[in-house]
Amino acid sequence: MTLHCIVVTPEETAFETDADSVIVPLFDGEKGVMTDHAPMIGRLGNGTLTLTTGGTTESHYVEGGFIQVLDNVVSILTNRVAAIEDFNRDDLEVNLRDALAMPGNSVEQLDQREKVVDAVRSQLRMLNRS
């Protein structure tokens, strides 16, 4: 028996696939899901979505959102999903430098800078793991 995983962004259903296990980045740590997992809902953070089928592992970057697990269906609603191959370390390092140089003269600017820095650092961590 496998899990059916559905990943949805505001624009589209990004993909649907079956997997033996799914690991998601919750806002407070990672969570692994296997078949017959208890029903749950969680808030996603930025990080690596890992799908394992047989001996094959597939990784994607997700940016926030929610996960629901019910009856061996894993539904992931996220702001953004991208394959690990879509990222380039040199570009991410430039993006991080640019983000750290963003102005922080107001609460709104600080919040925006923190959001961008967190996303880029999560993307770099994902590349370091692969």
Model-derived features: positions:
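Compact, glycine-rich, soluble single-domain proteins
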Residues: 4-97
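N-terminal export/targeting signal detector
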Residues: 1-4, 129
